[in-house]
Amino acid sequence: MLHDAIAFWPAALQSAPGPLTLEWALLLALAALAGHLVQRFTGLPKILGYAVFGTAVGLAGFAGGAWPLHGVGLYLLELGIAVVLFEAGARLSLRWFRHNPMVLVQSLVEALLTFFAAYLLLRALELDVPVARALAVVSVAASPAVLMRVVSDLRASGPVTDRAIALATLNTLYALTAGTAMLRSIDRGDTTMLASLASSAAVLGVSLLVGALLAALLVGAFKLLHPTSQDTAIVILALIGACTAVTTPLGGSAPLATLLAGIVLKQLQPRPWVWPRQLGTAAAMLNVLMFVLVSLMAAQADWHGAITWAALALVAARMAAKLLSLLLTGPASGLSLRQSLWVGVALVPMSSVALLLTSQFVAASHS
């Protein structure tokens, strides 16, 4: 691999961040090229190219990703998720739920059915209760990053697209709230259901406070800056980066805080947003990093027989729960059965949020 190829570098450079930085810089450039070629020659979304490239690099033995994630790698993953969820939250209008409250009911039914289907399956496979609960929470999460990237690449629009993004955003909100609360309970050594509920309220409260502060700061900045200027993009990214750095130490979830910040911002300024072009470029690079990292980690996991079959069973149970819940609640929420089926399919992918929660659970179990 590239890591071996640069082993001849002088000792001074070996101790500097140069080699690892060079590896990741080249990986991101090649991943972007792979995504471009996939879309150009097949018409498929670029994320397929990112995922295939990341998988190939992982199988080739690239050693640039430590597990569980920590340090700069963990921060960059959280930052990438935070930027995506901020944009997803800014698309979500609470007025929609007042006009069609069944959308919120639909999201709750789908999340609960997915959680219990995954939990019961994992308990049937004789996994311990804490492990089954953690993996069931991870199963609830969808992937707004995948959806929004596919929507951007294919220029998709319509009721199915809007509903899928809304439900994926809400699923992520539930998963981050419950998952972060479980992590706090593990840290305190109290994993009872009552402790988890109290922790969920605390995590949601702290994240909402930080998110509201972020939204207020952005509203103030937007009064001084042109919405599509380069300076606006810098301010948005800098404040999201600061939010990502401080929320977890305060007891909240950084991605959850930015998601809530986007929702609050949408309520404060409900007009349609035109995001700065520079923000889209920065977010695209973070997206490439996330998809490569997720694929790389998945390729390097220890997929021996029992784990592989358990993972496949969990994926099947999760898919069945999501599709069934959408088909049951779709007509009452204004979707046809065909539209409900496609929304359910759109909620099946799992990506960076699942990787983040899994890494945090592994780190907590080892501490």
Feature roles, as predicted:
Residues 1-367:
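Transmembrane helical cores of multi-pass secondary ion antiporters/exchangers
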